[in-house]
């Protein structure tokens, strides 16, 4: 999925993360700001990159300001920001099979 315009999801509240995506030129440019970067930086990066890969995002500038978010929250924020960048208002994945 192509990042068509800048978009943001999340807040700067405790236990949340603010994720911003912008169009990129070559690959994924990831910037992470977190008070727990030394303990959980690799895990934060993995959650973000896994979500971008699942959504087939190849070129983007991604900024994450983490305030202690869980992996599921990080993934949801990345997904939401990517969908917003494409003006997608409904999740295109069907959950009727569950």
PLM region descriptions:
Residues 31-47:
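Compact, glycine-rich, soluble single-domain proteins
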Residues 43-65:
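Conserved bacterial/organellar gene-expression machines centered on ribosome-associated P-loop NTPases
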Residues 4, 11-13, 32, 54, ...:
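Intrinsically disordered, low-complexity, basic-enriched segments
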């Amino acid at each position: 999925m192509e990042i068509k315009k800048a978009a943001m999801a999340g807040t700067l509240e405790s236990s949340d993360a603010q994720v911003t995506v912008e169009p990129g030129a070559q690959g994924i440019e990831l910037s992470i700001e977190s008070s727990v970067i030394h303990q959980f930086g690799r895990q934060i990066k993995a959650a973000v990159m896994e979500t971008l890969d699942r959504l087939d995002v190849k070129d983007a500038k991604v900024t994450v300001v983490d305030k202690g978010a869980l992996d599921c929250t990080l993934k949801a924020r990345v997904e939401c920001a990517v969908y917003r960048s494409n003006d997608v208002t409904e999740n295109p994945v069907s959950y009727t099979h569950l």
